[in-house]
Amino acid sequence: MLHTEGHALLRAVGQGKLRLARLLLEGGAYVNEGDAQGETALMAACRARYDDPQNKARMVRYLLEQGADPNIADRLGRTALMHACAGGGGAAVASLLLAHGADPSVRDHAGASALVHALDRGDRETLATLLDACKAKGTEVIIITTDTSPSGTKKTRQYLNSPPSPGVEDPAPASPSPGFCTSPSEIQLQTAGGGGRGMLSPRAQEEEEKRDVFEFPLPKPPDDPSPSEPLPKPPRHPPKPLKRLNSEPWGLVAPPQPVPPTEGRPGIERLTAEFNGLTLTGRPRLSRRHSTEGPEDPPPWAEKVTSGGPLSRRNTAPEAQESGPPSGLRQKLSRMEPVELDTPGHLCPDSPESSRLSLERRRYSASPLTLPPAGSAPSPRQSQESLPGAVSPLSGRRRSPGLLERRGSGTLLLDHISQTRPGFLPPLNVSPHPPIPDIRPQPGGRAPSLPAPPYAGAPGSPRTKRKLVRRHSMQTEQIRLLGGFQSLGGPGEPGR
């Protein structure tokens, strides 16, 4: 009902029927109601074209008296004052709107104000009314300028970051356009009561009145039509190096020095990656070391392994001690030299049998478990079969890898009870003081011959020297001699 009455009010106002509009408003119609486009009855009255211009002013005055708001905008952002300036409402309608609180500085969505629409319309009286209203509010007009296109139509441009007026097309590019913003000092406002107009003839005054109210001098073209030369750019200096703080850990890194490129290098090694002042170069190639497959010469023991020859025993003492026993041991050996040698140790050192026996003696001396009984010389076959870890010269491999030699500086006991329990302490029944053998001469006048240690060589032979380099707290040779002295004394001799 109200919506229909609203449309009826707009139609009555648009047709200039004041009495019908009064009846609708008295009947309860809303004066500020708009249509689908947001247009109100006051906007319709400002845009309407009546036969009598006085009817428009009476309709606008009546609507304002009924409470119509002049600052309501439609969907395009235009107010009733803008519609009045664009539709040719005249200075009287603009004065009524300004008197009821219309704002002349409001802009629409296109950025144009009521002043711009008045300039587009070319209504000088309305424009003067708007300027007076702006001055009354303390607003200085500095953003309006006009120009005339070659075709004779007027166009308006608004500067200071404002888009051009709506509905105005730009002319051909041949016409000069005012590309500069006009200041208030360059605007010449001509009024009817100008002081300099009395000096002119009446015909000249009429011609000046036909001209626009505003005159904006165009910028003068430069005297020299040649394009100006570009100014030389100031030289750019390299930026100053920043000073690093002492707290920065990367500040202590020395700056990388540039490496001159080498023609002989390949492309990959020539590239370097720099990161935080560090230079990463290509890594050197890795070479295989201590390998029999590499280009290096194999060690001397590798030939013996491949040929199947016997390997020498590794002593715990350094090789420098093999040059000869100390002086104390030499005196002890001189006392322990046997009178008669019944063992095959007196063989020539250069003979093959002596070399084979010396090899067997080395193998026996490595472990006390494989020692032969005193005074007996095993055969080479028995000596090879009795060695559990011996190396066969034909096959070149060990027979029993489970039995290993014990290497150490501790005392090696020959007691069978202690040897059956390896890794434990010796039993308490072992006497630390063995009986002293009787070494007195026998009644036959023949001096007892001391049993020589098994496979003992000549006093000065290298085999004897090589045997004494074993580092034990108690020599196994002395234990064997003490056992031999006890067997020579017999069961009745110790009591003597």
Curated annotation (Swiss-Prot):
Keyword Zinc attributed: no
Annotated InterPro entries: AN34A/B/C (IPR042637), Ankyrin_rpt (IPR002110), Ankyrin_rpt-contain_sf (IPR036770)
Pfam families: Ank_2
Ranges of biased composition (kind: Polar residues): 147-162, 180-191
Residues with the Phosphothreonine modification: T316
UniProt KW keywords: ANK repeat, Methylation, Phosphoprotein, Repeat
Residue ranges, compositional bias (Pro residues): 218-233
GO cellular component: pi-body
Ranges where the record places region Disordered: 147-473
Keyword Ligase: no
ANK repeats: 4-33, 37-72, 76-106, 110-139
The organism's place on the tree of life at top rank: Eukaryota
Family, similarity comment: Belongs to the ANKRD34 family.
Classification via PANTHER family: ANK_REP_REGION DOMAIN-CONTAINING PROTEIN, ANKYRIN REPEAT DOMAIN 34A
Protein name per the record: Ankyrin repeat domain-containing protein 34A
Protein species of origin: Homo sapiens (Human)
